[in-house]
């Protein structure tokens, strides 16, 4: 059995990862991932819905060849050109299928942040986006992720933010601005380069942290049409302090229960967690600094794929005890709300990729239920 697992792992190219393949030792996070991989593979062997043949393999953006990055970028832009599934009377600012994903996140934000379903909801949400790229835009790859630790010291010059045609676009124009989460950098304005330079966002703002604030939405609920650019102010201030590989490793190894783990990840215990770091590496600018509408910035999907990867690695360290476990309430406002249950349903509105709503317990594994992918 052990030999069969080893062969399967090697066949999928999941052990060691790209870093080791290039001749160096895998970093501490990859070592944890490798340690837990046999448990995931054993679970895959028992799955009735996921096989090696149907599995998607998610890779770090920097490990993707330029051609693969361009295919992903093209699919995201394709989704921003496809028609919305919302009625204009319900969501006037939903101009595209991409906007549908933003609107759904806006709708459910109070019940999917600092809650017991934070990880499972965003896991399925990211899978839904990945599925839309495949089914609606002909994408043949998987959702990439952003390994914060790998680029923590210099995110601006990383393959993710270097502004090239194979990046997720770079910094914003240098404008006078303040920052509410870290010292202001040399950006702050509209994207200056890269594939998403001319992308227009319409929804929000709702809870902007930008200063100066973006123009108000014509509707109180943020669903009105409010065209504007994507702004960024990329610095290493947060990533070099709180988003290093060791910070992620500490998150995984020092929190044995799901409650403390997700509390530390979401920064709800006072210290800055990696969830906040990923959102604010590009500053408190609009739209990324507004947690209701943060999916308006396409780098959101790489960020939350990494959040999901970290959860997966944490689970795999003790899968039998860390799979069917949950903690937290059902509202980010806390007081008076009931505790979340594994039998609660995950609602994705009109971006649900299947024909049903799934229970949280059906989404705790990445190789069972509707999900079928692994990280490399």
Give the location of each predicted region.
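Intrinsically disordered, flexible peripheral segments
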Residues: 20-376
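Fungal secretory targeting signals
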Residues: 1-24
């Amino acid at each position: 059995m052990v030999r069969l697992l080893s062969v399967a792992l090697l066949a999928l190219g999941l052990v060691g990862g790209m870093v080791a393949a290039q001749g160096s030792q895998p970093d501490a996070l990859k070592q944890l991932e490798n340690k837990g991989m046999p448990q995931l593979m054993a679970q895959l062997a028992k799955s009735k819905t996921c096989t090696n043949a149907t599995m998607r393999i998610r890779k770090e953006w920097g490990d993707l060849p330029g051609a693969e990055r361009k295919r992903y970028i093209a699919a995201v832009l394709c989704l921003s050109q496809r028609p919305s599934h919302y009625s204009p009377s319900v969501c006037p600012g939903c101009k595209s299928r991409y906007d549908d994903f933003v609107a759904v996140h806006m709708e459910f934000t109070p019940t999917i942040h600092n809650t017991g379903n934070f990880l499972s909801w965003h896991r399925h949400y990211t899978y839904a986006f990945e599925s839309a790229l495949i089914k609606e835009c002909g994408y043949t790859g998987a959702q990439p992720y952003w390994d914060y630790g790998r680029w923590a010291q210099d995110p601006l010059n990383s393959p993710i933010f270097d502004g090239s045609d194979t990046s997720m676009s770079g910094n914003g124009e240098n404008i006078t601005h303040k920052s509410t989460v870290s010292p202001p950098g040399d950006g702050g304005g509209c994207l200056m380069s890269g594939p998403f330079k001319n992308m227009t966002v319409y929804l929000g703002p709702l809870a902007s942290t930008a200063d100066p604030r973006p123009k108000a939405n014509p509707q109180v609920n943020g669903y009105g049409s409010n065209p504007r650019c994507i702004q960024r102010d990329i610095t290493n201030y947060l990533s070099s302090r709180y988003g290093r590989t060791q910070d992620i490793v500490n998150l995984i190894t020092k929190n044995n229960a799901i409650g403390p783990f997700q509390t530390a990840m979401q920064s709800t215990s006072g210290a800055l967690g990696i969830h906040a770091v990923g959102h604010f590496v590009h500053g408190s600018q609009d739209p990324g600094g507004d947690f209701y509408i943060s999916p308006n910035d396409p780098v959101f999907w790489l960020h939350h794929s990494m959040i999901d990867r970290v959860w997966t690695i944490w689970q795999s360290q003790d899968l039998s005890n860390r799979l069917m476990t949950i903690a937290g309430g059902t509202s980010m406002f806390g007081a008076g709300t009931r505790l979340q249950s594994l039998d609660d349903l995950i609602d994705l509105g009109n971006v649900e990729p299947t024909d049903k709503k799934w229970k949280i317990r059906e989404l705790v594994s990445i190789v069972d239920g509707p999900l079928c992918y692994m990280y490399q």
